[in-house]
């Protein structure tokens, strides 16, 4: 009896025999065929079929043989079937003589009498402006109406379930300009999905309707969003940013108004560095710069795992802050497919940065990971700067792409979603695709009211999103960029501009800061009525770092600063010393336990919980644990003998990490509590009582750990790198050796 697979093969063979009159044998000509459109494909296929002889009975042996072969193939291994399939050419069916036309729905989904001004005044519609072109032979209004129908309540036929309410939420075409391919559609606010947990709006619903199925319609050549307007009542349902560059300025000690350029970089190479070299690169840049970000593909690669590289970054930051006296910032990539993974990454990073947590931003690849990832970060970590990276956006936003939406629309949506900052390219002043008019993107992100290509958007106090400029920028390109934009209140991430500088990343970072200063001095008239380029050259004569940028990026210098060699007296040599840094010095530097704003008091700066005003009680918040770090800090608590925890054990084992005790004798001790889930001292004292029995009896809580029950998970236990007790016992085993 034949096997089931062989029987299946015979059936396939019979199918091939029956279909012998319907298809032609593949030829080399069809193998290389590339069809740009379906209609063209069908026409080519039809012309090729006319070249073939009509099937006859002589084809039957061939068909039967093919059927037998198919039977054997089906009865063989999967690998054999794959090999046969790969060897076959695609055969196209004969073109159908029937030309399908879309249902003309303009009587329902179009109302050209509607006034845009009135639609905006009513505030009940999201307005979207498209560049849309129907395919040849299709009426513009009918296609636009079909476009609106497919984007809202309709389909390609009338359905019996439609009622009056359904029609009341139809999307409506209210303006067309066929000659310029312009089409505007009004979407009722009620169409868009809302959260069931809090009633808030969701961007995925906006995109599903406005840029969803309409991108694949058979009667549309292309359609692309060029502007979108959100009415105030609907805009308020989105999160918007929770922090932005103002918070960075505050951390950097620059106030909250016109704090200027945040000089940043991307660690280069973008991939391939292991943890320690990565930390070294951070330390080197922070000698002159403010801000470092993970590049968008950096995360948790096997050769550079987060639990190894983040501690190196923290060490580098502490050392750089101590040596420069200036705060530093880092943006850690927490992008992942799984929201739980994103949250886990974020919590881990915050635990490692501890009291420097406010100096840490979270980077999310917002385009490739989607709006869900942006919202996960925004809602779970509202106190962190949400760094929106747009890698991949060019596939839909590029001017060369006629579908999707523009870069302007993309960045506008990021503000609505809650991005603290988003990359905006370089407005044609760097290597990325763009135009000088892209400054309107920055205006839409930062102003409370701004004009887009088609709509005037009022933000009603929604926090601004900070433009992040990157892509081929260096000190020489910055002055003209600032002049085009009109200000320098942006974040710069110059990878090559810093690490490509001939004298190293410290000088590269400093040169970028000098590029901003040179522009400001020229703007203030310090150099008289000379051109901007001549003003920058005058500045460079007395500033070696930006002069080094001229010597490094000579092609840029030739293009932007004609005659710079003669004006700077360039001889081919540079007086700038090569940058260097000592990793051992960095590793041995005293840990900087403070945050970045020295004006803050220890009591405010080091709190790790919250006060219940009603009961005047301080509650410890595990989410703000700071002592799970490389050393103890005195704000956590004191041992029973009064020894601050930043010196306990470290006095014997790690003297290089001991910093000054900021607590003033006689003043109120920092009110934080050890919780018993952390561990026990060797004498059995639970850590929620250690020291507090003497210094903070009012904060002592019950010991929640039951004898014999499992200890808390490792991440909430002591880790070896936290520190040592005075007798040398590592904190991972302190107390547990005796008690557990």
From Swiss-Prot:
Localization? Plastid, Chloroplast membrane
Entry binding sites for substrate: 213, 270, 390, 423, 470
Q: What is its EC number?
A: 4.1.1.39
UniProt cross-references to Gene3D superfamilies, sorted A to Z = Ribulose bisphosphate carboxylase, large subunit, C-terminal domain, RuBisCO large subunit, N-terminal domain
Primary place of residence?
plastid
Q: Which residues cross the membrane?
A: 56-76
Tell me which residues are marked as the site Transition state stabilizer: 431
**Which cofactors does this gene product need?**
Mg(2+)
Q: Which residues carry this modification: N6-carboxylysine?
A: 293
| Subunit annotation | Homodimer.
Among PANTHER family, the record links this protein to: RIBULOSE BISPHOSPHATE CARBOXYLASE, RIBULOSE BISPHOSPHATE CARBOXYLASE LARGE CHAIN
Known function: RuBisCO catalyzes two reactions: the carboxylation of D-ribulose 1,5-bisphosphate, the primary event in carbon dioxide fixation, as well as the oxidative fragmentation of the pentose substrate. Both reactions occur simultaneously and in competition at the same active site.
Protein name from the UniProt record: Ribulose bisphosphate carboxylase, chloroplastic
Gene symbol here is rbcL
């Amino acid at each position: 009896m034949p096997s089931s697979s062989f029987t299946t093969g015979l059936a396939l063979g019979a199918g091939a025999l029956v279909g012998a009159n319907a298809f032609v044998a593949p030829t080399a000509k069809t193998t290389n065929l590339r069809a740009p459109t379906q209609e063209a494909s069908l026409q080519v296929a039809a012309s090729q079929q006319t070249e073939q002889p009509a099937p006859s009975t002589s084809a039957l042996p061939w068909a039967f043989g093919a059927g037998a072969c198919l039977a054997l193939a089906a009865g063989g291994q999967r690998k054999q079937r794959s090999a046969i399939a790969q060897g076959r050419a695609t055969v196209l069916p004969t073109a159908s003589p029937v030309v399908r036309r879309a249902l003309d729905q303009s009587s329902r989904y179009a109302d050209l009498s509607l006034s845009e001004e009135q639609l905006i005044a009513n505030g009940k519609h999201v307005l979207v402006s498209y560049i849309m072109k129907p395919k040849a032979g299709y009426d513009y209004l009918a296609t636009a109406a079909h476009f609106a129908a497919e984007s809202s309540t309709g389909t390609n036929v009338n359905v019996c379930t439609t009622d009056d309410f359904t029609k009341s939420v139809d999307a409506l075409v209210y303006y067309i300009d066929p000659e310029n391919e312009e089409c505007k559609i009004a979407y009722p606010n009620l169409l868009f999905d809302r959260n069931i947990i809090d009633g808030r709006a969701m961007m995925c619903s906006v995109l599903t309707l406005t840029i969803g199925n309409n991108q694949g319609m058979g009667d549309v050549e292309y359609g692309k969003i060029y502007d979108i307007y959100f009415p105030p009542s609907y805009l308020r349902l989105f999160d918007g940013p929770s922090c932005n560059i103002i918070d960075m300025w505050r951390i950097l000690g620059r106030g909250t108004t016109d704090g200027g350029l945040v000089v940043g970089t991307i660690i280069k190479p973008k991939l391939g560095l292991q943890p320690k070299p990565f930390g070294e690169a951070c330390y080197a840049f922070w000698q002159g710069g403010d801000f470092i970000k993970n590049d968008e593909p950096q995360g948790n690669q096997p050769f550079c795992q987060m639990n190894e590289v983040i501690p190196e970054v923290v060490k580098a930051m502490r050392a750089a802050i101590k040596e420069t006296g200036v705060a530093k910032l880092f943006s850690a990539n927490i992008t992942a497919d799984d929201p739980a993974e994103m949250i886990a990454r974020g919590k881990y990073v915050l635990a490692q940065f501890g009291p420097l947590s406010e100096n840490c931003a979270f980077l999310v690849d917002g385009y490739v990971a989607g709006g869900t990832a942006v919202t996960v970060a925004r809602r779970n970590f509202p106190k962190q700067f949400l760094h929106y990276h747009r890698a991949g956006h060019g596939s839909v936003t590029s001017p060369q792409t006629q579908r999707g939406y523009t870069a302007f629309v993309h960045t506008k949506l990021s503000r609505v979603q809650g991005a603290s900052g988003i990359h905006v390219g370089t407005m044609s002043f760097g290597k990325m695709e763009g135009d000088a008019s892209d400054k309107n993107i920055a205006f839409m992100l930062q102003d409370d009211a701004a004009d887009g290509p088609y709509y005037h958007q009022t933000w009603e106090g929604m926090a601004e999103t900070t433009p992040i400029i990157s892509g081929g920028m260096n000190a020489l390109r910055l002055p003209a960029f600032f002049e085009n934009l009109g200000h320098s209140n942006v974040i710069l991430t110059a990878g090559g501009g810093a690490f490509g500088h001939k004298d190293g990343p410290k000088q590269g970072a400093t040169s970028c800061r000098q590029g901003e200063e040179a522009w400001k001095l020229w703007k203030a008239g310090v150099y008289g009525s000379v051109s901007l380029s001549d003003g920058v050259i005058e500045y460079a004569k007395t500033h070696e770092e930006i002069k080094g940028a001229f010597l490094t990026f000579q092609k840029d210098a030739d293009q932007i600063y004609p005659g710079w060699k003669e004006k700077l007296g360039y001889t081919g040599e540079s007086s700038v010393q090569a940058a260097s840094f000592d990793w051992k010095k960095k590793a041995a530097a005293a840990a900087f336990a403070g945050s970045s704003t020295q004006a803050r008091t220890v009591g405010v700066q080091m709190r790790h919980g919250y006060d219940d005003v009603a009961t005047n009680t301080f509650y410890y918040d595990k989410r703000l644990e700071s002592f799970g770090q490389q050393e103890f800090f005195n704000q956590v608590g004191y041992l029973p003998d009064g020894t601050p925890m930043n010196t306990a054990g470290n006095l014997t084992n790690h003297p290089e990490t001991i910093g000054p005790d900021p607590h003033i004798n006689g003043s109120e001790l920092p009110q934080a509590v050890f919780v018993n889930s952390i561990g026990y001292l060797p004498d059995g004292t639970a850590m929620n009582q250690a020291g507090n029995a003497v210094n903070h009896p009012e904060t002592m809580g019950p010991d929640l750990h039951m004898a014999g029950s499992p200890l808390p998970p490792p991440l909430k236990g002591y880790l070896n790198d936290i520190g040592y007790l005075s007798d040398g016992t590592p904190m991972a085993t302190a107390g547990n050796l005796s008690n557990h």
